[in-house]
Amino acid sequence: MELNVKFPSQRRIISAVSGIFLFVFIAIAFLGLHGLAQTPQALRSPEVHSDKRVTFRFRAPNAKEVFLGREGAQRLPMQKDEQGVWSVTTDPLEPDLYGYSFIADGVSLIDPLNSQMKPNLLNTQSVVHVPGPASLPWEINSVPHGSIHHHFYKSGVVGDERDFYVYTPPGYDPNGKKLYPTLYLLHGFSDDASGWTAVGRAHVILDNLIAQEKAKPMLIVMTLGYGAPEIVSRTGGSLRDPNLRQKNYEKFRDALFTEIIPEIEKTYRVSKDRNYRAIAGLSMGGAESLFVGLNALSRFTWVGAFSSGGTSEDFNATFPGLDSKANAQLRLLWVACGTEDRLIESNRKLHDWLKSKDIRHAWIETPGAHTWMVWRRNLANFVPLLFREKAL
């Protein structure tokens, strides 16, 4: 996988290094200086067994209690042995990638024995991969691979330095004559622009689907989804603040329309025809996809929302003027949510409202909660529908 990267600013580097030192300080506090002075027994964590059970281990002799926090599951208490190592073994897990952390005396920590990370602006976790058959769309296979390009730029709309990622499919030629369709794929609240590649494996999913001729070759643009960066705060406003939420969506839309899309269409071989432009996202990104896409049908023909969250349930105000006439402009409106997701009821209300307006759409309920395990499957099911003569 080719990676084109520009170096981040000094401020970003200092911030990252500071975070590493903070984690080391916390880890030392829990491991204990005495424990560090001794040569510890070699540990392995996580350990994936042949029956898909997973054992997690964490050395913290001074901790009074430790739990395993795993994505989409209840916390599991861990047991300490005489060497001060806490461990727990799960039931067999479905093949997938799972975020997890150790909660030691109330403090969430990554697994120091595992280099695989799930980056997040508020809650970074470790990741365990429970491998499955090659037929799973997020499993890396021996197929032609696309490339990921990482861009940095100064946003005049938002007033900060930010980044975006672009996936180009296998065979993409920047000097060729072929023009490609584009999917603008948005992350969720507290994720950053890398979410769909670092955690969602969007590039792997596209590589596999394109190789199987289940998806059209396309570019995917994954940009930072915060029009109001202050919304990602432990102490300030949040998505629960309706005014800040609206500012976030509007500023994001303006940056997308005036900065991101023009840059993509200048730099890459993509079509400017609305019939070859799609937008989709998860959680906050799903709400942004609906807000941006359904209010700009002159720009987007394909719209997807996975577990969308943060949209006002006053849909008439959020989507003014949207009615059955939109059916003539939309090629696909695809709305999905997990049945155990805390947002299922708000998404069902959206589904009912769309029905009441006679707006044609696909409504998908799947097993699962508000997790990446659901969203990887959403993407794998959504992408094959894009840029077809007949979608819905």
Feature locations, PLM:
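Positively charged, low-complexity intrinsically disordered regions
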Residues: 11-13, 35, 54
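A periodicity- and composition-biased signal for non-globular, repetitive helical segments
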Residues: 12, 16-18, 32, 168
